[in-house]
Amino acid sequence: MNPTIYLSCLVVFSVFLLGKVHAENEDEFVTEKQRLLSVYGDSSVDEATKYRNVDNLVTFYDKYSTLLPLTPDLSKRAEDLLRRYKEENARAVLVDGAPAQGGFWMPLVKLLIVQLGVEIASEGVKRAIGS
């Protein structure tokens, strides 16, 4: 096969794969964003559900923070809280693979992240209504 044709086919195939991966990531972003908005943006959702989804919120923010239109102040607060959350998770002592009971800081950091999630969700709803 002619090297030029081979290289052209390889480039077209690579662009196709990159486009497909980008579309899948965008679909995943939209799906997860809607799910987290339904958890943190709905006042009828109980606090236990919000606490159970803190890890998902942290993962989502880590992965897609550049796609979220947050104010600089809200973005800085989110970065600070997530840094603290990760530090506390790193310090957590595991007993038989599960975190030990007790501790003061982790529940406090989780509370702050839940409040931040609610604030980000309400900000997103306001922007959606405003546009």
UniProtKB/Swiss-Prot annotation:
GO terms for biological process: cellular response to heat; defense response to Gram-positive bacterium; innate immune response; response to heat. Coiled coil: none annotated. Keywords: Immunity, Innate immunity, Secreted, Signal. Residues 1-23 form the signal peptide. Its main location: secreted. It is found in: Secreted. GO terms for cellular component: extracellular space. InterPro entries: Turandot. It holds the Pfam family Turandot. Belongs to the Turandot family. A humoral factor that may play a role in stress tolerance. Requires Mekk1 expression in the fat body to regulate response to septic injury and consequent immune response. This is Protein Turandot M. It comes from Drosophila simulans. The gene is TotM.
